[in-house]
Structure formats: structure tokens, C-alpha cells
Amino acid sequence: MDFAPLDSLTEKAAKKELSKLADLLDQANTAYHANDAPIISDADFDAYKRRNLAIEERFPHLKRADSPTDRVGAAPSAGFSKVVHSIAMLSLANAFDEADVSDFVQRIRKHLGLSDIEALSFTSEPKIDGLSLSLRYENGTLVQAATRGDGAIGENVTENARTIPDIPEQISNAPDVLEVRGEVYMSHADFEALNARQASAGAKLFANPRNAAAGSLRQLDARITQSRPLRFFAYAWGTLSEPLGKTQMQSIERLQSFGFQTNDLTEKCNGPEELLAQYRRIEERRASLDYDIDGVVYKVDDLDLQRRLGFRSTTPRWAIAHKFPAELAWTELQGIDIQVGRTGALSPVARLKPVTVGGVVVSNATLHNEDYIAGRDNKGDVIRGGKDIRVGDFVQVYRAGDVIPKVADVDLKKRPADAIPYVFPATCPECGSDALREAGDAVRRCTGGLICPAQAVERLKHFVSRAAFDIDGLGAKQIEQFYKDGWISEPADIFTLRDRFGSGIQQLKNRDGWGEKSANNLFDAIDDKRQIPLARLIFALGIRHVGEAASNLIAQHYSTFDAFEKSMLAAQDKDGEAWDDLLSIDGVGTVMAQSVIHAMGQAAERASIDRLVAQLDVQPSEAVVTDGSPVAGKTVVFTGTLSKMTRAEAKSRAESLGARVAGSVSAKTDFLVAGPGAGSKAKKAAELGVQTLDEDGWLALIEGL
């Protein structure tokens, strides 16, 4: 799968990539977790998922409702009974270089309010490449074994797990309830012996030890599992009736005392330097190990700190998997293409002589932006020793977690004599409009707006995407077809299709892939989407910098479309209350706010939106409600120094109780929680009559929740 460069990725291209990534990762998840027959390598899966996350971080408003970053594993197979995990079996965030590890440590320190000199210990352990398994013991007896599944619901493989020698049936001196979690794997020697037996029997060979282990554990006949040489490493736990220890290391040692195999390469480390040193030691031993590993896992050692750090939607904040590096390859740069995205960004893509990198044939790679091609970074500093990139060059291609292959270097010794410097286009290759680069922006953008066919089509594709209007039967291919034929040029046209072509349905049903039934189904599907929540409408508009999360926040803030539209028009005056009110929304900064009022302030854009809304029944946004919470649906601002929790912890706690945390005080603020040094926010709250609490008052308000 080929992708455009990330740094120069347009919103149009980003949305298209996210759609492709969602489909690919969904198929890969099912193949890997449910069918035990991977269709891509683990490294490629990590790379695709990281690429997906990178696009979402750059274009948060493009995040899909079914985003792969919010998913763990795959749905359990119908062949096994289901097990609901009392504590979810989550995945791990990934680190791919030393900078990622340092960032991980700094994020933890910031969240906990720890200075750089305060002690912070971690454990490091090899990341076993196998199948995750949860074992439940009650009164020392194994009563249930379940795969991870989708993280919330797994498969009951109890009888199969009983056949694995490393999994004890009975344990002593353990908590009354104990869930042991770890990895089922197969050693290299056992894998080779198993495949030899398979070959002798004329049976299908396994591709690798991980596939063999997963396929063996998930047999419907436990006798087959028993015939396979499976092993188990314990490294974590789920539900406990009593703690195993105060630290990760103590708990692992306790699991070992119960008779479980734990990895002898697990070490305690202090700080990123020791973590990286241990990473290098494990990497050096990787080739000599008799089992597969694909990285090193770092975890905060102190379990109280783990609890304070908590979890994101699919990963713990207190752990990360440091993956082993990707591969490099050299090949010829045969051309440079320019792709135009939904927001007009011009993205250069290297067309390469196909080369295998990390087990995947690569023919396209990112060139980021015009500065990168010229040998500079976004700040104008020299990179690659100032070497520019030219068509005909022999270039180094790098694949890592960013999924999109990158052109990393140039071999000047092999540069053709007739190679000329690349001149980045000053006009859009799709519509011919000027392509301008604003100060501080790394990307050159087409100024054509909706007259640019590339932008118009990508905006329409975004409009019908799953996280937006999600109209059955109207996907990217149909949008391209209808736009080309002049049937749809703006979103409102979608909702007048029946009026314009319903009586002449023959025009649609005679097309390839269409019949009378499918045509009528499309019209019905469009009508079904006339009623739409405000948040989805805002997201569907495809406003630059406004993703799903921001759309939800904005919708909750203004409640109705009329209020939103009027406020955005009023916010054109940046000295007025409407502008300040927009900025008071947590997560809405100056750049995003400017983008919103620009989109709503242009006469042509607003007219197009009004034509759309005239076809719809836009549902008001409802405030978040949390039963029993005195702050549900309230707006809270934190200021000053908090002594009993960090700002990040306070924000996370408030949001978990249904509150909306804003960054500034306004007339819509319900509570100001002020510590020492509150300053201007406390003064403004007093002027507006906003209820002000100190930290103890806030904790008393939410006590017991």
C-alpha cells in the first residue's frame, strides 16, 4: 500500500489514506487475531497503525468513528464461547526510537508532576511475539482461560490452556481471585520440529512460530492443542482479590513463586538511559534467543504510580513497547508526483523503482515537502548535509512505524550527470490556481478552493465518510463518478439527487454496478441521513484542523446549528465576546478558531452550507450526563498550583465525571478551581460571578464519585 508524504499530506489525501488504513487494519486484525493467518507482517501492521495515528494527530478532525487507534485485537471467533474481561486486555503504545522513549518518560513525569531529579523506576522486558492469554484462578484452581479477543471480550480456551505444561492447574499461597496474563508462544526448536512433522504428514506448514502458537491454542479440539509444543510467559495480571506487591518487579517475582514462567531478561531500570542500555542488550541477544521477540516493553515499576497514570482508550499511560528498527534499501528515484488534498495541500510523492524494504515491495515514498526535497527542514536548517533530491538519483528508502516509506538519503556518487534540481510547482496541477505557502506553514496549498476538482471531490468523500454522514451505497468511487458526470458538486446536491433524477432513475440504473433496486436503495439511504446530529454535521463540513473530538466539543458548546452559525459570524470580530467564547472551548486554540470562522465567514462557503442545512434536520447536541455527578455537563476551569493532584490528573478526573474542562474563564464557566497563584482567571471569575473553589472544595464536591 503506497502513501503520500506525511508532512505535505493534504486533508483530501489524509482522509483517503485513513479510509484505506481502516479497511486494511480491520482485515489485518481479523486475519491475525481471529484467523491466525496474517496478511501483513507484524512490522507492517505496527507501521500502518502508527501512520494512522500520525495522520490523526496532524488532522484530528479526520479521525474516523471506527479509528484503528481506538481498537484492540479483533472480535472473538464464533467457534468459541465468549468471555467478558473484567479488566480490559489493552494493547501498548509504541516507541520506535530514542526520542520516543525520552518523550514517554517526560510525559509520565509531567502527568505525575515529578521533576527531572525525582526518582522514577521502570521495568524492561522482551516483547514476546505470541498470543495474549488471561488465566483466572479461584482459590488456587484454574477455572478459566481466555484470549484477548477485541480487548473487552475474548474466547474461552480453558480446556486448551490446560494442556500447556507451563500453565499450572493448581497454585498455592495465591490470592483467592487471581487473573494471570501473559503470552502463549512456541520456541524456534519446537516450531521447526512441528513443521517437520507437518511436512511428513503432508499437512500445511506454519509460516512462523507466532502463527503456529495462535493456531494451536485456538483449536476447537483440545487434543490437537495438546499435541502442539506450546509455552507460556507470565508478565501481567487482571482482577485480583489482593495485591501481588507494591511494584511491578515484586508482582512478577510473586507470579514466579506460584510456578509461572517469567522472562529472565526482565530488569529494573532508572531513567531513559538505563532503559535504552537494556534495550540494546536485549537487541544484541535477540538472534540467540529460542523464541521470537519484536521489541522491549517498559513499564512504570511503582503500582501506585501506574494507578495514578491510568489509561487512554486502548493503551495504558504507564507502559510502552519499544519496537526494533525497520530496514533500509537503495533504489532509483524515477519521478516526483504532486498530490492535492482536501485542504489544497500539495504533497510530493517519490515514484521509485520497486524495491523490497522490510519484507514489503515499495514503489512510492514520501518526500514530505519542498524544503525536504531541497535539503532543508521546516525551519530552514540543513539536513542530509544539504543534499537535494533529484529525479534519477539513487536514494535510500527507510521504513519504520510511520508506515509510509521515506526517502532518507541520496548517493551523490551515483547522481546522473543530467539530473537537474527539482522545481516545486507554483500552481496547482489539478486546477492551475496559484499554490501559495503561508508564513510558518511547511506546505504549499492550492488557492482554488471549491473550483479545484481535487479539493471538491475529496471534500465530498469526507462528507460521506463513516464518521460524517456515512451514507450506505455512497462511497469514494460513487462520489468520483457522480462528480465527474456533474451530478454532485457540493454536499447539498446529494440530498436533491432523488428530486433531480428520481423520475429518470433509468439514468442511474443503467450504469455499471447499478440496478433499479440499488438506485432506490441509495435514494432511501440518503433520506435516512437527513436527520443528523450537530457534531457529525460540523465534522462533515471538513473544516481544516477540526476533527471529531473538536466537532463534539464545539457542538456541545453551541448546542444548535443556528447558534453555531450566528456565533461564527459574530466571531469574525476578534475583539468581541463571540471570539473569546469560541476560544474558551477546551481544545480550541487560535489556529483552529481562525479556521472555523474563516470557513463560516466566506460567502460562497456559507451559502453552500446553508443550502445543505435547508435539506436537513440538524439535531441539537445534548450535554454529557453522568448519573450522580454534580459536575456533569458543567464547565470547569483549573488555575493556579494544585498540591494534591497534577493539572493533567485533575482534568482527567473532571472529564470522567462528565464535566467539560475549558482553558479560560467565560460567562459559561460553572466552576473555577483555583490554587495559589490563580491570577487573572480568579479575578475574571469574580467579575462574572463564577463559583470559585479551592482544591479541597473541589475534592469535597466530587468526593465518593
Swiss-Prot record:
What is the stated purpose of this protein? DNA ligase that catalyzes the formation of phosphodiester linkages between 5'-phosphoryl and 3'-hydroxyl groups in double-stranded DNA using NAD as a coenzyme and as the energy source for the reaction. It is essential for DNA replication and repair of damaged DNA.
> Protein name, please?
DNA ligase
User: Which protein family is it in?
Assistant: Belongs to the NAD-dependent DNA ligase family. LigA subfamily.
The record's gene field reads ligA
Annotated active site: 127 (n6-amp-lysine intermediate)
Q: Per the record, what are the reactions this protein catalyses? A: NAD(+) + (deoxyribonucleotide)n-3'-hydroxyl + 5'-phospho-(deoxyribonucleotide)m = (deoxyribonucleotide)n+m + AMP + beta-nicotinamide D-nucleotide
The UniProt transmembrane annotation reads none
**Source organism of the structure:** Roseobacter denitrificans (strain ATCC 33942 / OCh 114) (Erythrobacter sp. (strain OCh 114))
The highest taxon in the source lineage is Bacteria
Single GO molecular-function term? DNA ligase (NAD+) activity
PROSITE patterns with a match to the protein in the record? BRCT (PS50172), DNA_LIGASE_N1 (PS01055), DNA_LIGASE_N2 (PS01056)
For the ligand (Zn(2+)), the binding residues are 428, 431, 446, 452
